[in-house]
């Protein structure tokens, strides 16, 4: 069977039409639900995003997962400076999981599936041993560094291992707009 798994930050079960929400239309997700399966008793692995993805992709219990928080690797330089990150991709990204980690996408590839991840990664930095493609995804498009997802109009996203510039101006989060 084809498998599409949607994991969304800060999305509650009561916000989708397929679970009874009536104020905001979600027709495409509702159709996926009608034609597939939904979960009514499903919980994230932790309260924050990168550790939840680590738990989901590795199958490890939160207490044994490699990623315990949305940590930046400050030892690499001025990682909180969005302008510096735009100029130097080596400042981007979170702590990587160990290279020998087996993740669900790698297991699915062994079973003959083609795998893709679209959205936030946050489980390593560009060039590390734990980029999405090195962890089993055939295709990745999105934010390598989850912190970059806090900008409304990102200046770049990643297509597999490479930055793809989007011609959006950098708007640093919490900047007062005129």
Question: What would you call each of these model-derived segments?
Answer:
Residues 1-178:
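Formylglycine-dependent sulfatase
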């Amino acid at each position: 069977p084809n498998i599409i798994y949607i994991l969304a930050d800060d999305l509650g079960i009561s916000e989708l039409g397929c679970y009874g929400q009536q104020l905001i239309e979600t027709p495409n997700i509702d159709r996926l639900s009608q034609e597939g399966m939904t979960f009514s008793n499903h919980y994230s692995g932790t309260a924050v995003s990168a550790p939840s993805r680590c738990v989901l992709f590795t199958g490890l219990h939160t207490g044994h997962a490699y990623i315990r928080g949305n940590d930046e690797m400050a030892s690499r330089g001025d990682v909180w400076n969005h302008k510096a990150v735009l100029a130097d991709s080596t400042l981007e990204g979170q702590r990587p999981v160990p290279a020998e980690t087996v993740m669900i996408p790698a297991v699915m590839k062994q079973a003959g599936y083609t795998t893709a991840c679209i959205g936030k990664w946050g489980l390593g930095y560009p060039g590390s041993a734990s980029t999405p493609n090195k962890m089993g995804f055939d295709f990745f498009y999105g934010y390598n560094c989850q912190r970059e997802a806090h900008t409304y109009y990102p200046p770049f996203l990643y297509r597999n291992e490479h930055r793809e510039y989007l011609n959006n101006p950098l708007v640093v989060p919490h900047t007062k707009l005129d």
